[in-house]
């Protein structure tokens, strides 16, 4: 595959993944923090604080999971490299 096309595809996938994460986060936090029947047009103080905390936690967990998955991926790559070296040296 052409490197430019691969880079473009990776960028498109990243945008799609970020949009998916945003949609899940807003849906989950809205469901948790905002009652289904609105009393007022504006968010209450409690709803606003709840949404702020929910989004903060969601983003924190997303970042932690990304770091852990990267770490595991690097470990897998290292293991595969060692296995290939072991096979090629015999």
Swiss-Prot record:
Chief subcellular location: mitochondrion
SUPFAM superfamilies, per database record: Tim10-like
Coiled-coil segments: none
InterPro entries assigned to the protein according to its UniProt record, in alphabetical order: Tim10-like, Tim10-like_dom_sf
Gene3D superfamilies documented for this protein: Mitochondrial import inner membrane translocase subunit tim13 like domains
Entry's Gene Ontology BP terms: protein insertion into mitochondrial inner membrane
UniProt entry keywords in alphabetical sequence: Chaperone, Disulfide bond, Membrane, Metal-binding, Mitochondrion, Mitochondrion inner membrane, Protein transport, Translocation, Transport, Zinc
Motif Twin CX3C motif: chain residues: 29-54
CC annotations in GO: mitochondrial inner membrane
Source organism, top-level taxon: Eukaryota
GO molecular function, one term: metal ion binding
Record-annotated disulphide pairs: 29-54, 33-50
Compartments where located: Mitochondrion inner membrane
Topological category with respect to the lipid bilayer: Peripheral membrane protein
Domain notes: The twin CX3C motif contains 4 conserved Cys residues that form 2 disulfide bonds in the mitochondrial intermembrane space. However, during the transit of TIMM10 from cytoplasm into mitochondrion, the Cys residues probably coordinate zinc, thereby preventing folding and allowing its transfer across mitochondrial outer membrane.
Function, as annotated: Mitochondrial intermembrane chaperone that participates in the import and insertion of multi-pass transmembrane proteins into the mitochondrial inner membrane. May also be required for the transfer of beta-barrel precursors from the TOM complex to the sorting and assembly machinery (SAM complex) of the outer membrane. Acts as a chaperone-like protein that protects the hydrophobic precursors from aggregation and guide them through the mitochondrial intermembrane space.
Subunit structure: Heterohexamer; composed of 3 copies of TIMM9 and 3 copies of TIMM10/TIM10A, named soluble 70 kDa complex. The complex forms a 6-bladed alpha-propeller structure and associates with the TIMM22 component of the TIM22 complex. Interacts with multi-pass transmembrane proteins in transit.
UniProt record similarity statement: Belongs to the small Tim family.
Full protein name: Mitochondrial import inner membrane translocase subunit Tim10
Lineage, top ranks: Eukaryota, Metazoa, Chordata, Craniata, Vertebrata
